[in-house]
A protein has these predicted regions:
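Cysteine-centered catalytic environments shared across enzyme families
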Residues: 1-174, 185
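Active-site adenylate/phosphate-handling loop in enzymes that bind or generate adenylated species
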Residues: 179, 187-198
Length: 198
Protein backbone atom coordinates (compact mmCIF):
# COMPACT_ATOMS: atom_id res chain seq x y z
CA UNK A 1 0.00 0.00 0.00
CA UNK A 2 1.30 3.48 -0.85
CA UNK A 3 0.37 7.02 0.10
CA UNK A 4 1.04 9.95 -2.19
CA UNK A 5 0.70 13.72 -2.09
CA UNK A 6 0.23 16.26 -4.87
CA UNK A 7 1.23 19.95 -4.86
CA UNK A 8 -2.30 21.00 -3.82
CA UNK A 9 -2.16 18.91 -0.64
CA UNK A 10 -4.46 16.15 -1.87
CA UNK A 11 -3.67 12.76 -0.37
CA UNK A 12 -3.90 9.59 -2.49
CA UNK A 13 -3.75 5.97 -1.34
CA UNK A 14 -3.19 3.07 -3.74
CA UNK A 15 -2.07 -0.53 -3.68
CA UNK A 16 0.28 0.05 -6.62
CA UNK A 17 2.69 2.90 -7.33
CA UNK A 18 1.46 3.00 -10.93
CA UNK A 19 -1.85 4.46 -9.74
CA UNK A 20 -0.04 7.44 -8.18
CA UNK A 21 2.12 8.16 -11.21
CA UNK A 22 1.25 11.47 -12.83
CA UNK A 23 -0.88 12.54 -9.85
CA UNK A 24 1.60 12.76 -6.98
CA UNK A 25 4.83 14.66 -6.62
CA UNK A 26 5.95 12.46 -3.73
CA UNK A 27 4.90 9.11 -2.33
CA UNK A 28 5.97 6.61 0.27
CA UNK A 29 4.97 3.18 1.56
CA UNK A 30 1.84 3.10 3.75
CA UNK A 31 3.42 1.00 6.45
CA UNK A 32 1.63 -1.95 8.09
CA UNK A 33 0.16 -1.21 11.50
CA UNK A 34 -0.19 2.52 10.77
CA UNK A 35 -3.04 4.90 10.08
CA UNK A 36 -3.03 8.28 8.39
CA UNK A 37 -4.62 11.28 10.10
CA UNK A 38 -5.70 13.99 7.66
CA UNK A 39 -6.11 16.37 10.58
CA UNK A 40 -2.50 15.90 11.68
CA UNK A 41 -1.18 15.19 8.18
CA UNK A 42 0.96 12.27 9.31
CA UNK A 43 1.15 8.52 9.75
CA UNK A 44 0.91 7.07 13.25
CA UNK A 45 1.75 3.56 14.35
CA UNK A 46 -1.19 1.99 16.20
CA UNK A 47 -0.28 -1.70 16.19
CA UNK A 48 2.79 -3.13 17.83
CA UNK A 49 3.36 -6.63 19.13
CA UNK A 50 5.92 -7.44 21.77
CA UNK A 51 7.59 -9.96 19.47
CA UNK A 52 8.57 -7.18 17.02
CA UNK A 53 11.62 -6.80 19.26
CA UNK A 54 13.94 -9.80 19.58
CA UNK A 55 14.88 -8.82 23.13
CA UNK A 56 11.25 -9.25 24.20
CA UNK A 57 11.14 -12.89 23.08
CA UNK A 58 14.73 -14.16 23.10
CA UNK A 59 14.20 -16.19 26.29
CA UNK A 60 10.85 -17.70 25.26
CA UNK A 61 10.55 -21.46 25.33
CA UNK A 62 9.57 -23.12 22.05
CA UNK A 63 7.57 -26.29 21.78
CA UNK A 64 8.31 -28.40 18.72
CA UNK A 65 4.79 -29.80 18.91
CA UNK A 66 3.24 -26.30 19.06
CA UNK A 67 5.30 -25.16 16.05
CA UNK A 68 4.34 -28.33 14.15
CA UNK A 69 0.63 -27.85 14.89
CA UNK A 70 0.68 -24.12 14.08
CA UNK A 71 2.42 -24.75 10.74
CA UNK A 72 0.00 -27.53 9.78
CA UNK A 73 -2.99 -25.38 10.72
CA UNK A 74 -1.64 -22.42 8.74
CA UNK A 75 -1.16 -24.50 5.58
CA UNK A 76 -4.48 -26.33 5.99
CA UNK A 77 -6.39 -23.02 6.28
CA UNK A 78 -5.08 -21.97 2.87
CA UNK A 79 -6.37 -25.10 1.14
CA UNK A 80 -10.07 -24.15 1.09
CA UNK A 81 -10.84 -23.83 -2.59
CA UNK A 82 -13.46 -24.61 -5.19
CA UNK A 83 -10.87 -24.71 -7.97
CA UNK A 84 -7.76 -26.85 -8.47
CA UNK A 85 -4.74 -25.50 -6.62
CA UNK A 86 -1.06 -26.30 -6.58
CA UNK A 87 2.14 -25.62 -4.69
CA UNK A 88 5.42 -24.05 -5.74
CA UNK A 89 8.12 -26.59 -4.98
CA UNK A 90 11.74 -25.47 -5.23
CA UNK A 91 13.17 -28.54 -3.53
CA UNK A 92 14.38 -26.45 -0.58
CA UNK A 93 13.37 -27.10 3.01
CA UNK A 94 10.54 -24.52 3.29
CA UNK A 95 8.67 -25.38 0.11
CA UNK A 96 9.21 -29.12 0.67
CA UNK A 97 7.66 -29.04 4.15
CA UNK A 98 4.72 -26.88 3.03
CA UNK A 99 4.13 -29.08 -0.04
CA UNK A 100 4.17 -32.23 2.10
CA UNK A 101 1.60 -30.74 4.48
CA UNK A 102 -0.60 -29.64 1.57
CA UNK A 103 -0.38 -33.13 0.06
CA UNK A 104 -1.39 -34.64 3.41
CA UNK A 105 -4.72 -32.78 3.23
CA UNK A 106 -5.31 -32.87 -0.54
CA UNK A 107 -7.58 -35.94 -0.72
CA UNK A 108 -10.38 -34.55 1.47
CA UNK A 109 -12.26 -31.24 1.28
CA UNK A 110 -11.15 -28.81 3.97
CA UNK A 111 -14.55 -27.05 3.73
CA UNK A 112 -16.35 -30.19 4.94
CA UNK A 113 -13.80 -30.78 7.69
CA UNK A 114 -12.50 -33.79 5.77
CA UNK A 115 -15.88 -35.54 5.48
CA UNK A 116 -16.05 -35.32 1.67
CA UNK A 117 -13.55 -36.37 -0.97
CA UNK A 118 -11.82 -33.56 -2.81
CA UNK A 119 -13.07 -32.85 -6.33
CA UNK A 120 -9.48 -33.13 -7.61
CA UNK A 121 -7.68 -35.32 -5.08
CA UNK A 122 -4.20 -35.01 -6.58
CA UNK A 123 -2.08 -32.04 -5.59
CA UNK A 124 -0.08 -30.43 -8.39
CA UNK A 125 3.43 -29.15 -7.68
CA UNK A 126 5.44 -26.79 -9.87
CA UNK A 127 9.14 -26.07 -10.21
CA UNK A 128 10.83 -23.63 -12.57
CA UNK A 129 14.40 -23.27 -13.75
CA UNK A 130 16.87 -23.39 -16.57
CA UNK A 131 17.32 -26.84 -18.07
CA UNK A 132 19.60 -28.93 -15.88
CA UNK A 133 19.31 -26.68 -12.82
CA UNK A 134 20.05 -28.63 -9.61
CA UNK A 135 16.93 -27.20 -7.91
CA UNK A 136 14.75 -28.94 -10.48
CA UNK A 137 16.26 -32.31 -9.58
CA UNK A 138 15.68 -31.67 -5.86
CA UNK A 139 12.08 -30.61 -6.50
CA UNK A 140 11.45 -33.75 -8.57
CA UNK A 141 12.87 -35.90 -5.76
CA UNK A 142 10.55 -34.29 -3.19
CA UNK A 143 7.53 -34.49 -5.53
CA UNK A 144 8.14 -38.20 -6.12
CA UNK A 145 8.45 -38.77 -2.38
CA UNK A 146 5.26 -36.94 -1.36
CA UNK A 147 3.25 -38.04 -4.41
CA UNK A 148 2.26 -34.82 -6.18
CA UNK A 149 1.52 -34.46 -9.88
CA UNK A 150 4.73 -32.60 -10.67
CA UNK A 151 5.28 -30.08 -13.44
CA UNK A 152 8.79 -28.97 -14.31
CA UNK A 153 8.83 -25.71 -16.24
CA UNK A 154 12.04 -24.99 -18.14
CA UNK A 155 12.76 -21.60 -19.59
CA UNK A 156 15.59 -20.25 -21.70
CA UNK A 157 17.79 -17.27 -20.95
CA UNK A 158 16.14 -15.46 -23.86
CA UNK A 159 12.65 -16.09 -22.43
CA UNK A 160 13.86 -14.66 -19.13
CA UNK A 161 15.28 -11.59 -20.84
CA UNK A 162 12.09 -11.12 -22.86
CA UNK A 163 10.02 -11.14 -19.65
CA UNK A 164 12.06 -8.56 -17.72
CA UNK A 165 10.09 -5.52 -18.92
CA UNK A 166 6.79 -7.09 -17.76
CA UNK A 167 8.34 -8.27 -14.49
CA UNK A 168 9.61 -4.77 -13.64
CA UNK A 169 6.21 -3.32 -14.49
CA UNK A 170 4.41 -5.71 -12.13
CA UNK A 171 6.85 -5.71 -9.20
CA UNK A 172 7.51 -1.97 -9.49
CA UNK A 173 11.22 -2.10 -8.74
CA UNK A 174 14.53 -2.18 -10.59
CA UNK A 175 16.25 -3.93 -7.69
CA UNK A 176 18.46 -6.53 -9.38
CA UNK A 177 17.97 -9.26 -6.77
CA UNK A 178 14.19 -8.84 -6.77
CA UNK A 179 13.97 -8.82 -10.58
CA UNK A 180 16.24 -11.86 -10.82
CA UNK A 181 14.12 -13.83 -8.33
CA UNK A 182 10.79 -12.66 -9.78
CA UNK A 183 11.46 -13.44 -13.45
CA UNK A 184 11.24 -17.26 -13.18
CA UNK A 185 8.21 -16.91 -10.87
CA UNK A 186 6.50 -14.70 -13.46
CA UNK A 187 7.12 -17.26 -16.21
CA UNK A 188 5.89 -20.05 -13.93
CA UNK A 189 2.75 -18.14 -12.92
CA UNK A 190 1.79 -17.72 -16.59
CA UNK A 191 1.99 -21.49 -17.12
CA UNK A 192 0.03 -22.27 -13.94
CA UNK A 193 -2.69 -19.78 -14.89
CA UNK A 194 -2.97 -21.28 -18.38
CA UNK A 195 -3.62 -24.68 -16.74
CA UNK A 196 -6.50 -23.28 -14.67
CA UNK A 197 -4.74 -23.99 -11.39
CA UNK A 198 -4.58 -21.49 -8.54
Amino acid sequence: LYIGYDDDGTVYVASELKALEGECQRYEPFLPGHYYSSREGKMTRYYKRDWFSYDAVKDNEASVEAIHDALEDAVRRQLMSDVPYGVLLSGGLDSSVISAIAEKYSERRIESDGKERAWWPRLHSFAVGLKGAPDLAKARLVADHIGTVHHEINYTIQEGLDAIRDVIYFIETYDVTTVRASTPMYLLARVIKSMGIK
